[in-house]
């Protein structure tokens, strides 16, 4: 593979497909979970919070190993037949992104002055209306959480390689392509592919900055 090889386009497209799919799933689950954890008071909250924070720091290779074990022939999810497919990569990246989104949103919600929560409740707001109001209050922090999650999973190698297999034309993404070219000693191509990753990250960050200006 070369930096401007025609075969590069499917790799870029798959990178975006896997990353965006995982990020959307993590957002749909993680944002409501983070808001709930930030506002709720219940026994065992500290334990659950500790688990979320632990998940935020979980090494990608461990995520890859756990996902591999779940999807392998002897695993409980073997019937899905996802191992060495893009779906397996999406699952692994979702596992990495979800705690990040939930944890950062939870921290942002918990930092909202309690007086504001009481004020909203005193106006007769339902629990869902309270959560929605607080979510709007921390919308910039939510955007930041999604950016952090995107940055982590778009460049992830270990889990993607373990459960995807780096199969040309099927599960090869930019990060695993960089690793492959580096292993072959073709550092020029590896750097060029890394440049494509930087372009993706820069594009997303510029779009997020523009959106942040509208949200502020």
Walk through the language-model features, giving the residues of each.
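Interhelical loop and adjacent transmembrane-helix boundary motif
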Residues: 1-7, 161-202, 206-207
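Membrane-interfacial helix termini and adjacent extracytoplasmic/periplasmic loops
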Residues: 6, 63-94, 164-167
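Transmembrane alpha-helices
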Residues: 24, 104-105, 109, 113, ...
């Amino acid at each position: 593979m070369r930096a401007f090889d025609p075969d590069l386009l499917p790799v870029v497209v798959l990178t975006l497909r896997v990353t965006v799919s995982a990020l959307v799933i993590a957002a749909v689950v993680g944002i409501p979970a983070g808001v709930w954890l930030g506002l709720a008071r219940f026994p065992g909250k500290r334990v659950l919070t500790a688990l979320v924070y632990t998940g935020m720091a979980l090494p990608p290779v461990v995520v890859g190993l756990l996902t591999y074990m779940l999807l392998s022939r002897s695993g409980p999810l073997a019937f899905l037949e996802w191992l060495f497919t893009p779906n397996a990569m999406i699952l692994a990246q979702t596992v990495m992104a979800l705690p990040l989104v939930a944890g950062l949103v939870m921290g942002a919600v918990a930092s909202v002055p309690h007086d504001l929560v009481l004020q909203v409740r005193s106006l007769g707001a339902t629990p869902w209306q309270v959560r929605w109001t607080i979510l709007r209050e921390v919308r910039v922090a939510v955007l930041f959480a999604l950016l952090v999650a995107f940055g982590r999973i778009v460049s992830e190698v270990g889990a993607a390689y373990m459960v995807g297999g780096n199969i040309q034309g099927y599960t090869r993404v930019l990060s695993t392509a960089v690793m492959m070219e580096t292993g072959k000693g073709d550092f020029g191509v590896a750097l060029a592919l890394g440049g494509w990753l930087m372009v993706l990250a820069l594009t997303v960050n510029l779009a997020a900055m523009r959106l942040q200006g509208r949200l502020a």
